[in-house]
């Protein structure tokens, strides 16, 4: 679904698509690992232990979270740099718009489903 939204918005040529998708998929894999393995585990630990957490432990978790977020930022910068030789600047902007639109659409769908269950 996401791939079709991106493909439609970017109107990739065959050559662009052949170069773009491996870069995009590698980036998605990397950011998903950071988001779900690092950031999520830190947030779970914070939620489960916040009531009895010492300042020392809170500081440690803040540092871990900051490190993971910096890693995510670095990954995004590398991704944009890698795309610069494949897509025009306009298409890179269109990619960001397509991803944002997709997220909004998915969030709206989740809210709709959640509302339907209540």
Residue ranges and their predicted role:
Residues 5-86:
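Amphipathic alpha-helical segments
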